[in-house]
A protein has these predicted regions:
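Histidine-centered catalytic micro-motifs
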Residues: 47-59
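Short hydrophobic "helix-edge" motifs at membrane interfaces and signal-peptide entry regions
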Residues: 42-48, 99
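Active-site loop-helix segments enriched in His/Asp/Glu that coordinate
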Residues: 88-134
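Residues that scaffold the ATP/ADP-binding catalytic core of kinase and kinase-like folds
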Residues: 29, 59-60
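Active-site gating loops and adjacent loop-to-helix segments of metal-dependent hydrolytic enzymes
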Residues: 60-96, 123-127
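Divalent metal-coordination and catalytic microenvironments
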Residues: 5, 24, 53, 109, ...
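N-terminal metal-binding scaffold of metallo-dependent hydrolase/deaminase domains
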Residues: 1-35, 44-45
């Protein structure tokens, strides 16, 4: 059970909220409740956030474009590097990168993600045999 001094519920902020969790699911929410022995106590409780715009593959580019040379680097040079990088990624590598990024988001408290990627074809431009590959 979780006891929150304040919790943001669908109807707005509530005080003294006790949440019952059974089998990993919220089964009861009680307002103006009293904490019970063994409750996890928090001062404020919010719903988990959603990341509405993720490019998980860019996590694997971290460090490749951290410094720019004045007058030589721009959004367009970054974009060219990104597409060259994508040309080398396999579906298995994309899956591993996304698994890491999604795990990091979950650990940070995100509950959902809207994922966008630029990989729709194999390196060289041919379509994947399995259209569900990417």
């Amino acid at each position: 059970m979780i006891f929150a001094e304040r919790a943001l519920l669908p109807g707005g902020w509530a005080e003294q909220v006790r949440i019952t969790v059974t089998g990993g699911h919220i089964t009861e929410v009680s307002k103006a409740a009293a904490p019970q022995p063994g409750d996890t106590r928090v001062s404020a409780l919010l719903p988990a956030l959603s990341n509405l715009h993720s490019h998980a593959f860019q996590r694997a580019m971290a460090g490749m474009t951290e410094h720019r040379i004045a007058g030589r680097d721009s959004f367009w040079t970054w974009r060219d590097l990104m597409y060259r990088f994508l040309d080398r990624l396999t579906p298995a590598q994309m899956e591993a990168i996304a698994a890491l990024v999604f795990m990091e988001m979950q650990e940070a408290g995100y509950a959902a993600v809207g994922e966008f990627h630029y990989v729709h074809h194999q390196p060289g431009g041919d379509a994947y045999a399995d259209i569900a590959e990417l």
